[in-house]
């Protein structure tokens, strides 16, 4: 992220977050289609919902709550969400060795790093260049399990992909709320 106007920094961060969220959603669907019998999907989704680590972060749960928070707070939450996945996604490509969707998986880590840098650039701009130490995650997500012949591994990966999709949706929402608050545009209705 070279020096550029704040509006461009926000636009780039939102585009990166949207792309990552779409990639996470596509991956989740591809995994579900390949490994989870249709009759089990709903019950497994409900069981997995309680296991997202990000639920322990006191972050807003939707657009309305996000609008009550400052931009710096939303950037910090977004950064925490992104950083919590940097380790686990490095194992993602090994899980999907034969998948068309995951021809792009090797780049997921780079895309997350890109977004992390973009969020950090926004934080520097909004905090007058003096970033304060934020919350550091003492715990993060487990790595994806590469043993796809085990039911436990399948369920673990399914749950992780569900959380990955949810967390990227949150980060995208926070970035869009901030962008819309600062730069009213026609694309702000979501």
Curated annotation (Swiss-Prot):
UniProt-annotated location(s): Secreted
GO molecular function, one term: hormone activity
Cysteines engaged in disulfide bonds, as pairs: 52-163, 180-188
One GO location term (cellular component): extracellular space
Gene Ontology biological process terms from the UniProt entry: animal organ development; growth hormone receptor signaling pathway; positive regulation of growth; positive regulation of receptor signaling pathway via JAK-STAT; response to nutrient levels
Residues with PTM Phosphoserine: 105
Gene3D superfamilies in alphabetical order: 1.20.1250.10
Alphabetical list of SUPFAM superfamilies matching this protein: 4-helical cytokines (SSF47266)
Keywords: Disulfide bond, Hormone, Metal-binding, Phosphoprotein, Secreted, Zinc
Entry binding sites for Zn(2+): 19, 172
Record family assignment: Belongs to the somatotropin/prolactin family.
Function: Plays an important role in growth control. Its major role in stimulating body growth is to stimulate the liver and other tissues to secrete IGF1. It stimulates both the differentiation and proliferation of myoblasts. It also stimulates amino acid uptake and protein synthesis in muscle and other tissues.
Protein name: Somatotropin
Organism of origin: Loxodonta africana (African elephant)
